[in-house]
């Protein structure tokens, strides 16, 4: 991140402020043959950053997944676990919404 976006704040503080401004929605969709897919939307950042987050989630959840159209898709129903992992990554609990 450039210093212009954060007014000269250190990058760590700038990154945390960015995380606090994001509202993340976690939902499950049923796909073909009754397969469930957890969809995480509302994360801002480049495709590279989203792929990094997706990669970390996939390894912690032992699930497959991908990044499509600015959303992370994970195979299976992982709503609660994804919320816990995102909170450990520094996203505030109040900004993470699980859609039933």
UniProtKB/Swiss-Prot annotation:
It comes from the Archaea. InterPro entries: DENR/SUI1_TIF, SUI1, SUI1_arc, SUI1_arc_bac, SUI1_dom_sf. Pfam families: SUI1 (PF01253). SUPFAM superfamilies: eIF1-like (SSF55159). Disulfide bonds: none annotated. One of its GO terms (molecular function) is mRNA binding. Keywords: Protein biosynthesis, Translation regulation. NCBIfam families: PRK00939.1 (NF002096), SUI1_rel (TIGR01158). Belongs to the SUI1 family. This is Protein translation factor SUI1 homolog. It comes from Sulfurisphaera tokodaii (strain DSM 16993 / JCM 10545 / NBRC 100140 / 7). The lineage of its organism: Archaea, Thermoproteota, Thermoprotei, Sulfolobales, Sulfolobaceae.
């Amino acid at each position: 991140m450039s210093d212009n976006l954060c007014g000269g704040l250190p990058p760590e503080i700038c990154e945390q402020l960015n995380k606090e401004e994001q509202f993340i929605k976690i939902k499950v969709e049923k796909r073909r043959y009754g397969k469930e897919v957890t969809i995480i939307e509302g994360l801002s950042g480049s495709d590279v950053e989203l792929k990094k987050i997706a990669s970390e989630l996939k390894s912690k959840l032992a699930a497959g997944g991908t990044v499509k159209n600015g959303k992370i898709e994970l195979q299976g129903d992982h709503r609660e676990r994804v919320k816990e992992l995102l909170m450990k990554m520094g996203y505030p609990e109040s900004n993470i919404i699980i859609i039933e």
